[in-house]
Regions:
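Hydrophobic helix-coil surface modules that form long, contiguous segments used
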Residues: 53, 148-285, 313-316
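A surface-exposed beta-strand-loop module
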Residues: 71-128, 487-499
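Beta-strand-rich binding/interaction modules
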Residues: 76-80, 417-418, 431-506
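Glycine/proline-rich low-complexity spacer/linker segments in large multi-domain proteins
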Residues: 112-157, 511-532
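Zinc-dependent metallopeptidase catalytic helix centered on the HExxH motif
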Residues: 268-330, 388, 402
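Acidic/His/Gly-enriched intrinsically disordered linker/tail segments
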Residues: 278, 302, 308-374, 378, ...
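Amphipathic alpha-helical substructures
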Residues: 361-451
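Solvent-exposed alpha-helical segments and adjacent loops
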Residues: 521-672
Length: 672
């Protein structure tokens, strides 16, 4: 199954849209225990965008008939059996067939050939879902280049590929070369078969019996070595943590489209993405881990996609934990939920299939990883890690649903487990916890602390285990307590030898909950996630500037669906129920609201800003300032005059949603 990298850009997983298409076309998928086998002979003719395939399929013996789907550009022949065309998809891309009168041994041969045009369905990076031209071949499950048989969704395969001599071919399975052909043998059940290739330079080394590869368009040995070493390190890490790496190979493959895709045993990274210095220690481990979660244990989507949250927790959260930054990572996860999914915009975690907008990301990633963090805290590291290994041993190359993975990690009794999944998988919303009345009294030589804790969300109480931190006079380190709360209000008492002087509830953000406004510093995400974003364009903007601001508004409308662009002369004041962006240095409203954009660390003047005592002039810098007061409706200023810089803001700012102030070198387009 294809994955999109989330650790850098939080990309949308359009592989799942293919899955939904399959489900619609086949009406119902019988998740059969039977695994079919494809013996594929593939010839590629890239200059003609053409391919031919011989597929010797082994179906279960005594199979009378089978329905399958293939792309409509292929001409298909099925010697010795009856082949019937049943129809095609609404867009004409796919054709549905039935084969009848199958031999008793279940062996069927299909011969097909045709063109692969690159003007088909586009992914989120502008990359077609099927490509075969003089530079690239990319074929996956959504390409329907291998018959999709509705009764047998998983397969093993052996594939022999003939391609131009200067091409390298990548797929799943053990790789070998015979004469001018490349052979792939995949013994483990797969949900789809990939065929990727082009005029690559191949770099390889072996690590603990796993063949590591890097495929680049140019012979950049230093870049290849960095990815080979990082791949070895992370495969060792996760193998020790979970169980042996499930494939014989792992490859990092350069792509001419700027993708961040992850497939079984390889990842497809854009030519610019692959050269970003942080990718080997952020995106790469995320994609490697997906070979266990999602491409090693498959996802039963009927009760939600657990893979994204578990992968984010064991890769991105783990990396931050190693650097002592895990509490802030969790705070940002909770902040994302509040910004984009709170106030009735979320849905049950059991209904999450893939990320398609900010709200689905906040549920399927942020809420999900917090669930796994709470499970780990509930039972402790040892039980959590034992559960992870047991889950892997039980379900590898089989589908598992969300309750399955929770059950493997849950340390309590069955009744508690059922209540847990009901609370976190099927309920929408989040707990809202707060301190109530707090008193300290002295009894004999002890101090008795009485703490009221409330759940303020609408609806019934959650069952929670909440950390409580108590600072005592004379103690440098606070005392850590655990509060078990299953009512909307409860009073807890504690006895100490020293006087309590301060308390903090969930100080390290260990509980999935709504953040208090004081825990949410000003950030771009608060504007992006508002019910409405009002973008105020300066009346005096030039034609080119106005065009650029309109393109920014259009791009953000596509992302957030809540954008309204207005002229400054149409604004008598700022709305109290919307986030407002003041656009451009010459904005007529800027002077009027200048004070709201000024604080002890940022000062705004006519053609410059000062951030942490560093003056940034408008002619050389593009800046973003926010009103730091979260008690008011969000207000932001984008200081940009150059149309190129404005379009840079359109692209870059959505990736900085946790930031509260930004400055860029306008000409270099780099963050300062």
């Amino acid at each position: 199954m294809m994955r999109l990298d989330q650790s850098m850009f939080w990309f949308a997983h359009y592989r799942y849209s293919w899955l939904f298409l399959i489900l619609v076309l086949t009406a119902s998928v019988n998740v059969s225990a039977e695994i079919i086998h494809h013996e594929l002979q593939v010839k590629l003719y890239p200059q003609q965008s053409r391919m031919s395939v011989i597929d010797d399929m082994q179906l279960p013996a005594e199979t009378d008939s089978a329905d399958f789907t293939l792309r409509s550009s292929f001409t298909v022949v099925a010697p010795g059996v009856e082949l019937i065309v049943r129809g095609q998809s609404a867009d004409g891309r796919l054709r549905h067939y039935q084969i009848n009168r199958l031999p008793a041994d279940g062996k069927v041969q299909l011969l097909y050939e045709g063109n692969i045009l690159s003007d088909s369905v586009q992914g989120p990076f502008g990359m077609p879902d099927s490509v075969l031209d003089g530079d690239t071949v990319y074929l996956g499950g959504g390409s329907y280049w291998v018959p999709r048989i509705e009764d047998f969704p998983r397969c093993r395969f052996r594939m022999i590929v003939s391609a131009p001599l200067d091409w390298e071919i990548i797929s799943q399975g053990m790789r070998s070369v015979q004469d001018d052909a490349v052979i792939f043998d995949m013994a483990h059940p797969q949900e789809e078969i990939y065929l990727v290739g082009g005029p690559y330079k191949r770099f390889a080394q072996t690590h603990d019996s796993v063949e590591l590869e890097v495929y680049l368009y140019e012979g950049d040995t230093e870049l290849a070595t960095s990815y080979l070493q990082a791949s070895a390190n992370y495969i060792s890490l996760y193998s020790d943590w979970i169980g042996a790496y499930p494939y014989t190979r792992f490859a990092v493959v350069e792509n001419r489209w700027q993708t961040g895709y992850g497939m079984p045993s390889f990842t497809l990274l854009g030519s610019r993405v692959i050269r970003l210095p942080f990718i080997p220690d952020t995106s790469l481990p995320h994609e490697i881990l997906h070979n266990w979660w999602g491409n090693g244990v498959y996802i039963d989507f009927s009760k939600g996609n657990w893979s994204e949250g578990l992968t984010a927790y064991m890769s991105d959260h783990y990396s931050n934990e190693q650097q002592g930054k895990d509490a802030e990572y969790r705070r940002k996860a909770l902040e994302r939920y509040v910004n984009f999914a709170a106030e009735g915009r979320d849905f049950a975690l059991a209904d999450f299939s893939s990320r398609h907008d900010e709200a689905s990301q906040a549920v399927g990633y942020s809420k999900s990883l917090m669930l796994f963090h709470m499970l780990r805290r509930f039972g402790g590291d040892e039980l959590f890690n034992q559960g992870i290994r047991h889950f892997w041993q039980q379900y590898q190359f089989r589908p598992a649903d969300f309750p399955d993975v929770i059950k493997a990690l849950f340390p309590g009794a069955d009744a508690e487990y059922k209540a847990y999944i009901e609370q976190w998988l099927y309920r929408t919303g989040a707990p809202e916890i707060a301190l109530g009345e707090v008193t300290v009294s002295k009894i004999n030589n002890d101090y008795v602390l009485s703490v009221e804790i409330r759940q303020q969300q609408k609806g019934p109480a959650y069952t929670l285990r909440i950390p409580l931190e108590v600072s005592l006079e004379g103690n440098q380190q606070p005392v850590r307590e655990q509060v078990d709360l299953s009512a909307k209000r409860k009073v807890h008492t504690y006895r100490y030898n020293q006087r309590p002087r301060a308390i903090r509830l969930d100080p390290e953000y260990d509980v999935f909950r709504l953040l208090d406004p004081l825990e949410r510093p000003a950030s771009l995400g608060r504007l992006f996630g508002a019910k409405q974003q009002v973008l105020v364009m300066p009346q005096g903007a030039s034609k080119d500037q106005r065009k650029a601001w309109r393109e920014l508004a259009a791009a953000w409308t596509g992302l957030y669906k809540n954008v309204r662009l207005v002229d400054s002369n149409d604004m008598n004041g700022l709305p109290e129920d919307a986030a407002v962006w003041l656009l451009g240095w010459q904005n007529e409203l800027l002077e009027r609201f200048q004070q709201r954009l000024t604080s002890s660390t940022q000062q705004l003047s006519a053609r410059a800003v000062t951030i942490n005592n560093q003056r940034l002039a408008a002619d050389r810098h593009t800046v973003v300032l926010l009103d730091p007061d979260n008690s008011r409706a969000p207000l932001a200023f984008i200081g940009a005059d150059d149309p190129v810089a404005i379009l840079m803001m359109a692209r870059k700012l959505p990736h900085y949603s946790s930031y509260g102030v930004l400055a860029f070198d306008t000409h270099q387009q780099e963050n300062i």
